[in-house]
UniProtKB/Swiss-Prot annotation:
PROSITE patterns: RIBOSOMAL_S15. Pfam families: Ribosomal_S15. Gene3D superfamilies: 6.10.250.3130, S15/NS1, RNA-binding (1.10.287.10). It comes from Lachnoclostridium phytofermentans (strain ATCC 700394 / DSM 18823 / ISDg) (Clostridium phytofermentans). This is Small ribosomal subunit protein uS15.
Amino acid sequence: MISKEKKQEIINAYGRNANDTGSPEVQIALLTERIAELTEHLKINKKDHHSRRGLLKMVGQRKGLLEYLKKTNLEGYRELIARLGLRK
């Protein structure tokens, strides 16, 4: 679970303003953070298949948002994956 402070930091870093929670850049950054936390959880709890299913759902959601961003704003897409350290 992402704390309020961490979530606000991500929104400030990737959003267009402090209240921008809906832009694809912010959504992708938040999903990336949640995926990283859940990945760490699953390294410890290998048999937690319910969380694994949620992780796969989040990865798919992020993939769809990345495809949308690539289609609508190619330069923003390239910048975002470089900042987040995603491979594409």
